[in-house]
C-alpha cells in the first residue's frame, strides 16, 4: 500500500501588514496545491499565521495530522519567528514560497515584500540547521 504524503500548508504575515493580500494568497495558493497535488493530503492551516498564538494552534493542528512537510506561503512580510517556530516544533522540512510582489506604483507602499522576508527566514533556518 502506498503511503500518502501529509503536507501542511500555511500562509503567514506580520500583523502590521494589511491582511487582504495574505487572505487572498491563502485561498489562491492553498487551492492550487489541492488541485495540482491530488495524491497528497494537503492539511490547510485553520488560520493565517500572524501571531504567536496562531502559530501555536497551527503547530498543534499539523501535529494532529502528522504532517511530513510544511509549505509556508508569504502572504506579506513575515519575521523569521514563524518559519523558525514551525520547523523547531514540527521537526519537518519546510518549503518557503515567496509569490511575486503586487505591482508597485509610485507613492504607495509594498504590499508583501515576500522575497525579502523569505531570504531573511532562509538565513535564520540555515543558522538553526533546519532543512528548507
Predicted regions and their residues:
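An N-terminal assembly and electron-transfer interface module characteristic of large anaerobic redox
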Residues: 1-132
